[in-house]
Amino acid sequence: MREKEKEEQKMKKLMMVAGAVALAGMFAGCASTREVVQKEYERVIALPPAERIHSPNKAVDDVARLSFDLYNFCHPLLKEYEAATTNHREYTGFMNDVQCVMKDEGLGEEDAMAKVYALVQGEDKDRPDAEKVWPRIKEGWAAANALNPAKKLAEIARLVVRNQEISESAAKLPDSFKDGDFQSKLQRAAEVDKITDQLTQSAELLAFLGEQYRKVQVNKFYNK
């Protein structure tokens, strides 16, 4: 009987090793992609609050105010998401791994998520309860889901439209100072460049949040 138990334990260990090798093999080619994904995630999360751009030109100053107000309306949404997920690295890691598999293996999002989910579940099978990863991923998902993704996505869609409207106004600003002297034209052009950069950051921030909340909704099928 003891020999049988030893053999079973040996087989379990071999299966655990095989699972680890399979997981490592799957993500070996994904390492560089994961690093890129993680760096981009960290870059957007670290975007600072906006600074108000001032201009003596009323048209430029008005658009600068609109851009500032929009960004500082969006930025707290980013900080809210960060605060909800910052202590749930397993969840953000899971979502980043899904993105890696999508890019490296050319899979659709649902197929990539199913693949990573199956691998995590396989790894968890032989782990002690305290070391299982999937329950921690579920905790992270629940924290993000508590922010009401459907409502957030509707709000983000509205803000994307507003960003586009302000961007179109910014594109017309050079007409407001075309008759000025050379030095003032340079100064106004520099101000418009700053406004454009700010609007670009707003667009990046909104795209990031939209993607995160959309993934929360897709992931709900695995967190019932």
Regions found by a protein language model. Give the residues of each.
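Intrinsically disordered, low-complexity sequence elements enriched in Ser/Thr/Gly/Pro
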Residues: 10-11, 186
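Sec-dependent N-terminal signal peptides
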Residues: 14-23
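C-terminal motif of bacterial Sec signal peptides marking the signal peptidase cleavage site
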Residues: 26-29
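Extended amphipathic alpha-helical interaction segments
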Residues: 84-91, 95, 100-224
